[in-house]
Structures are given as structure tokens and as C-alpha cells.
């Protein structure tokens, strides 16, 4: 099956953000000044995704799914990924003239072949991505079947195969972990950062043609993820009140990430003093300039649905006042990323967004924007002959590997303690895996092991057997030493 043409694809849309200035682009919409109230009455949440047919007409049964409890109870990240997954499957059916209500297991099997193995599809995906596709399609059809809109879901066929499994089970990839994680060594990260985000050339010299207006912001964000291991959504939605003060007496400062942006589980995190200094420099320079421009152009005055923070109490409850002067409170932990876009603070110079990361226009930067920024940095590296690729989550992986190697190295060689003292240390603080689990916020230590066991497999044995690694070797050098034997670790340009 060939790629879908644009005129046959279902359209992925999002409900309006009330905090953003909005001008009706249609005379029809202009006739409904109470549109926001109508949407709220129907349970349509600001920024929520939904689908329209290729010609722009609504399919009520599809729209009902997107405002159902089954969909809206999903984590924000799952909603954002499930919507385009469902869009793609419905488009796959539409281009063949198949109504989604008539989809069968055979159609789903065709889709699996096209998505993963069809040589005519230039955008084939791996096991992990298709597993997510299947989860989204199952969620959609389970709800439609429950509502009586389809008789049988194409994802669930209770007809056992010769092996005893249902047919649909055969579509579930058995090797989801076959997708290779990648990590950057410290020197590879610095090279990617300097060239991709910082305006250097491949030869290490400054690029005189570089016009990076936001390099202060972008460098500070990369340093924040690199030094803290925060997920993209966690780091990309931080508000000013969540950034700890840089303390010259400590190398890492502790802070807390909110529950609603941390996969439903708030947690402590640690961030380096160097990263905090980069953020401070961004706040007083590039960010301050963007805020000044926005104020001068009256951009904040045009916002109608913002909440101005009065204070955050010791219970982490945010006290705020809205545009109408009505006061309210909300737990900081319950603020999802879209909620955070609407919160502002007042300084002696006027209003400004509460979120740390802003666009050039002085408005909060939706965290997914960072994916495009990293992609542009990768393109710049590629064009300048630096064959290092990085995405935001790769910085989290790299942080975890760096911490794990550091802890194992400290336990086995550098602490200078007896075996009995080492056992006592582990009894009090836990082994390196548990400590890294804490740093990453994983619920289960097995998740940590599943992700990071391969690159450090045999590391403890290697530390005892290979005395050629000097005692004064730095952790960065040591990671470079083991990178040679771990194909997933990117140290210099990939060959």
C-alpha cells in the first residue's frame, strides 16, 4: 500500500488554548462569540487532540471517543501520541475506501506489514513504535465496541491459532527491547552541544555566520537535561519557582518535579550548579529580552484566560487570581503542562510567564518544540561534518549511564574501603541500581536494569581484571574507555 496522499488523510486537530490570542478565520466561527463556553459545556478541554475526516467533516463517533473518559483519563503524553497513531490507521483505511467501522483483523495485519516491513514505505518503524500503535488502536476500538459502534474490534479476535494464541497476539512484536538505546559520552555531548546549539564549526572554531538568537536558552536547556536526567516533559515545563537557587557550596542542588508532568508521580531531582548558572544567565539575558518585547507589544495584555500567581505555600499549593479578579488555589502537583502555559507572575516591571522556557515572542514554549530544536541542531551537525545525533531523551539515558558507571566505579575501586565497609554502605544507601532508579524516578528498579544493563554488563569484572586503567582516571575518561566495547554508546562521530 502506498503512502497516504494528503487529501485522503484524516486531519489531526487540537482544541484552542484560551490563553492564546485568537482571531476567527471564518465568518461562521465569528458568529459564535460564546464558542469557548460551548466547548467547555461539551467537555472539550483546551488543547485536546481530535480528528476530522479528510474533507474536514466531523465523524461524531470518532469525536466522542476523544472526549470520553477512556481517552481523557490517559496521561497527557499518551493522549499526544495516541491521537496521531489512530489518525494514521484511519487514514490507512480511508485511502483504500474502507470505513473504520468495517475494519477487520486482515486490515490490521495489512497495516502491520505496511508499517513495519513494506519496502515501499520509506517511514517504516520498529517494534516499540508499532507496539504503541497497537495500544492506541486497541484503546480506540475497545471503546467503540463498548459503545456498540462496531460489532468486533479488529485488534481482538478470540479465534485461536495453531499455537493457541489469538490472531491479534501474533501482531504484537515480541522484541520491543530490540530498539537500541543510545548514550553520549561527555566529550561527544560537548561536541554535539557546541556545534549544534552553540554556533561552533566542525573544526572547533566559532562560526562567524552563526545567528543563533536563542543559543543561551537552548544551551541552558540541554545542560539542564544532561545534568539532571529529567524527561523532556519534566524539564520542558519547569516554572521559575521549581528552579532551586545555585549554591556555591554544593555541586548538585535538589528540587522537585510536579506529579502531573512526571508520569503521574512527583519526585525529587538533582541538577548541577553549572546547569543552574546557565539557566540563571538565560533568565537575566535572552529570556528577559523576550519578556520585554512581549510587554512592549502588549502581548500579555491580550491574553484573556491567564492566572496570576500570588504565592505558593509550604504545602505546594498555588494561590492565584484570574483576569476577573477571582481568587483560587490549585496544587502545584496537579498542574499539567497545558495548565502551566496559562500561569503568569507579576514583577516590578509587569506580567511575565511563570514557565522558564519562552519563545522569542515571550510566550511559554510548548515542550514538544524542543524536539524540533534538537532536530535542527542535528541537521547543523550533519551539514558541518559532525556525525553525532542527539534527541532530548538521549540526554536522560546519558545521565543515567554516567551516574551508574560513577557509582559502580566508586563502589568497586575508588572508595578505598574494606569489603565489610562496602556492605555497610550498600545497606545504608542501596546499591548503584537503586540509587540510579531514585535519580530517574523509575517506579521499579527492573525498569532501570532493563534500560541500562547492556552497556555496563561485565563492568564490575572488568574493573577488577583490567589494571591498565589508571587509578586517577576521571569518570569521563573511564566512560570513554568502556564505550569502545559498547556499541550503543556514542563517543566520537559515528563511523
Predicted segment positions?
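Short, charged phosphate-coordinating catalytic segments
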Residues: 148-150, 225-249
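Long, amphipathic, Lys/Arg-enriched alpha-helical "connector/arm" segment
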Residues: 167-214, 263, 274-281, 285
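Short, basic (Lys/Arg/His-rich) helix/loop patches that form interaction surfaces
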Residues: 371-438
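Basic, Lys/Arg- and aromatic-enriched nucleic-acid-binding interface segment
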Residues: 194-232, 427-430
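C-terminal secondary-structure termini that scaffold catalytic or DNA-interacting sites
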Residues: 9, 459-495
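N-terminal core-binding DNA-recognition domain of tyrosine recombinases/integrases
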Residues: 62-78, 86-174, 208-209
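Conserved tyrosine-mediated DNA breakage-rejoining catalytic core shared by Y-recombinases
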Residues: 237-346
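Short functional hotspots where side chains directly engage DNA or cofactors
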Residues: 250-258, 391, 415-456, 462-466
